[in-house]
Amino acid sequence: MTDSLNFLDAVAGLPEQLAAAHEAAASVHRDALPKAESIRNIVMLGMGGSGISGDVVAAAFNDELPVPITVLKQMRTPAFVGPDTLAFAMSYSGGTEETLSMTRSAAEKGAQIVAISCGGELERVALDAGGLHIACPPGFLPRAAIGALVAPLCTVLYRMGLAPGAQAMLMYAQTQLARRRDQCGVRVEGAANPARELARQIGRTIPLIYGGGAIGAVAAYRWKCDVNENAKAPAFSHSYPELDHNEICAWGQHGDVTRQLMTLIELRHGFEHARLRLRFDATREIIDECVHQVLAVEAEGEGRLGQLLDLMYMGDWTSCYLALQNDVDPGPIDAIFALKARMAELP
């Protein structure tokens, strides 16, 4: 199976994409940025491959930000949104229905809008509301444009003084992504490539991806979406500690089936709470006999953002190799476009 949209090339360009998007956001005149002293809360508005940039920033900087941050994936903004709200709206295409609806809702309530897109309707909505628009580096599929959206979010928060560590974290992340690309790029064959080897081990089993804490939860969900969209295969995700209060009860009832079908993938990072590390070990003892195999991916790099993006990047590469080894083209997402066309026909 060929890569008809050169999706692997887009994946390989992530480190440079992150740098270019940072430069674009850094060039915005400081006077155009919202004033930090006027902000009491932050909302991240976005869906899919664009919206997850908000999840990334929330997970990476929630411990540093002096105001609460909420990620929204719906049609309207909640009642607390108002003039003291910093509303980031992310849509790579600029035309995502739900993001446009939430942005209009936030604008109606007087929120301070910062939109990030390649133009489109979102740019017009933001500017009409007196907000700021930051242009993304063009030419990527939205799910391969995570750097084009994460970097402006981090850069704006840094320049506003809300996330003083964000600029250094971006640099650390870019360094680690380049290092990971050297390990996982298409020129590295066989078991020497950790993403190819992981895809080989997964084979045609169904991935069950577990992470720990905020970083692990976002990474696990991104992996799930990567397998869904790139490999066109089912996958499921959950996170510690929540899964130990519900999902753990599901294992064993159909153990003979899950032992054939499910591969548990543990996403580990250096910022796990000590109790979460114990939960990984204790829960694995229960689940191990109920799944085909247990695999682990360890985050590398410095800083919360760097380790989160590193885990996500491993998911990008692994899902693409999983697609190709199963004769699936990783680029096209026909089901999503068919649904969008159907929705456009409805009132």
What does each of the following model-derived ranges do?
Residues D3-G13, A20-A32, E37-R40, Y158-L261, ...:
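Active-site phosphate/pyrophosphate-binding segments
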Residues D3-N6, A10, G49, S53, ...:
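Catalytic cores of large soluble enzymes that bind and process phosphate-bearing ligands
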Residues G331-P347:
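Short, small/acidic-rich helices and loops at N termini and domain boundaries
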Residues L18, L153, T318:
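A residue-level signal for conserved active-site and pocket-lining positions in enzyme catalytic cores
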Residues V71-Q74, A233-D244, Q293-E302:
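A generic structural motif
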Residues E37-R180, R200, H269-Q293:
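Glycine-rich phosphate-binding loops that contact phosphosugars or nucleotide phosphates
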